Design a protein with these regions (language model features):
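Eukaryote-biased recognition of intrinsically disordered, low-complexity regulatory segments
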Residues: 1-8
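Glycine-centered recognition micro-motifs in short, flexible terminal segments and loops
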Residues: 66-67
Length: 67
C-alpha cells in the first residue's frame, strides 16, 4: 500500500498503481482532466505508464462545460 496526497487529501492506494488506475478508481478515466504529479504536468500519453509512489502529491482538475 502507498500513501499519496490527492487534491490535498491523504489517500491510501494499492502498490504499483498508475495514474490511469487512479483515474479509473474515481471514474475520471473518460473525462477531460489535467494531472499534476509532484509539481509536474503529466501528458495524457503517460497516464498508463506513470506509477505512483509513497508520498506523491497529485492534483487532478476536470473540466465541466457550461454556458
Amino acid at each position: 500500500m502507498s500513501k499519496i496526497q490527492l487534491n490535498g487529501k491523504k489517500v491510501v492506494i494499492k502498490s504499483n498503481y498508475s495514474l490511469l488506475d487512479l483515474l479509473k478508481k474515481y471514474k475520471l478515466a473518460n473525462k477531460k482532466v489535467a494531472i499534476e504529479l509532484n509539481g509536474t504536468i503529466i501528458q495524457k500519453t503517460g497516464y498508463k505508464k506513470k506509477k505512483l509512489n509513497n508520498n506523491d502529491k497529485i492534483e487532478i482538475v476536470h473540466f465541466i462545460g457550461g454556458g
